[in-house]
Amino acid sequence: KYKLVILSHDDPHDPNETWILIRDKAQALGLKVLLAEFVGTYTKKTPDGKRFIHSFGLDKEGKVIMPSAKNKNVEYAKPFEIDPSDTLIMARGIGTSAKSGNRSWGDMCKVFEYEGYTVINSTECHNICNDKWMNNLIFKRENFNTPKTVRINHPEGAKWALEELDADFPLILKTAAGSRGIGVMWIESEKALHGLVQLLYREDEYIDILIQEYIKTDYDVRVIVCAGKILGAIKRPIVDGDFRSNVSQGSEPELHELTEIEASESIRAADAVGGLLTGVDFIPAKNREKDKPYFIEVNSTPGLMGIESTLSGAAAKPLGKKLKKEGTSITT
């Protein structure tokens, strides 16, 4: 029986709804599934060479039961045996060491990679996708259509960056690390940009700041790609009174039928970052049938709740089948 281990971090601002969805679909297809919260989870080998994952247990709602000042006697769940020949590892919410403050999560996944496990997604893929500047470099290298983007390297770098960008206001300012539209700002003048850059550097001297040309649009598109196949796509309208389209910011997703060029370029974008399961975000071209869309970023831990409800359950089931297929291919 093939196994799926889902390693994730249950952030109050990014709840673990997706891992419950994936677990249920995978179990329905006959996979044995372990949900493990990154915090507190560790792995070790026994003297006879067998590897186990040790993690805290879950309650009936899938919430991790962790020790606290009021609940000090929480024990680890029964160790879960894994083997490269029959186990898939899915790492969600791994972030980067700068973002999470914890290198051990990525290091644990590297152990699995070194030992031959199929890890969805790889640590390299996570590192690329959790850095918007690295996303941009990959897009440029692989000849994707993407908004012009420049990195600001120091507190007084706004003027140089504007000259390098060579784009009209308004502009978009982003921090290199961030999700759900957080850290994305609308800039209307050089004075506003200069002041904001100085403020951000005052708060964090190691921050990475990007400025990007603004592509006017009524919506952007999120495409879920799994192992080279498209599971579904949604249109995310711009939020009223805002310029962002994240579902977490209030955008209400709708079905989106991809053109041939949108579909092929989305698959190519997922492949460019080495992703097995990704969310690819783009702004459509004016002539969608002929021109390439503007790619914004690839997400290595895409949430599936918004797209699953919009597609009426049409995304998670094929995902489960893909995971099962990946599992059966482990031994071939």
Region locations from a protein language model:
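Protein kinase-like catalytic core scaffold
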Residues: 171, 232, 278, 294-297
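Glycine-rich phosphate/pyrophosphate-binding beta-alpha loops
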Residues: 299-311
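Short glycine-rich anion-binding loops that position phosphate/pyrophosphate groups of nucleotides
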Residues: 94-96, 176-178, 301
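Active-site nucleotide/adenylate-binding loops and adjacent lid/helix of ATP-dependent enzymes
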Residues: 4-8, 19, 109, 114-115, ...
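A long amphipathic alpha-helix within ATP-dependent nucleotide-binding catalytic cores
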Residues: 208, 213, 243-295, 317, ...
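Conserved N-proximal alpha/beta basic substrate-recognition cap immediately N-terminal to
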Residues: 11-148
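Phosphate-binding site of ATP-dependent enzymes
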Residues: 182-269
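Structural motif
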Residues: 3, 87-88, 294
